[in-house]
Amino acid sequence: PVLEEIELRLTWQPNDEMPLVDRIAKIGRALIGLKEVEYFGEAKEGRLRDRMKGLIDRLLIPLEEKYHGAAKDGPVVPRVKNLRSAILPDMVKGKVDDAERALRWRQLADVYLAQQLSCYPPDYLAERPSVTRILEIVERFEEDTSDKVRKHGQLKAVLEVGEAIEVSPDRDRNAEVDPL
């Protein structure tokens, strides 16, 4: 029923005859396409990985240039963390007027979207995905389109711990990326 609900929100007819992984991929393409229309004015073509990177950069680079003076490179989560650290302080201290506060809320929403996008590995459903992977994607779609999450069953995790690594106790908390 989750995929059907998402399809209905997209104003589609539910398509339960389509193979499950193909159906999930089609919904994923539609969701990124909607965001591309919102931010670029049109849906893009090409590999999903490139489209996601393009949208993430469209969301983050203008804000990085504004708040840090230049675009950053590297993993999305540290970039998002740095932007939030730049956007929030004056809001919290009440140093912005209503118009600036509204603008910054929009910027925080854009940063959140970039982080959401980065949580979707582009090849996650390739090559006969496990039931767990399929469930993870469907649950993520549900959460990202409705802000609600239902429990759909139990998940299993296997945690393998490798050899210990030496870490300096003098960690630089202002570093842009985690040195590990």
What are the roles of these predicted feature ranges?
Residues P1-L180:
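Membrane-interfacial terminal anchoring regions of lipid-handling membrane enzymes
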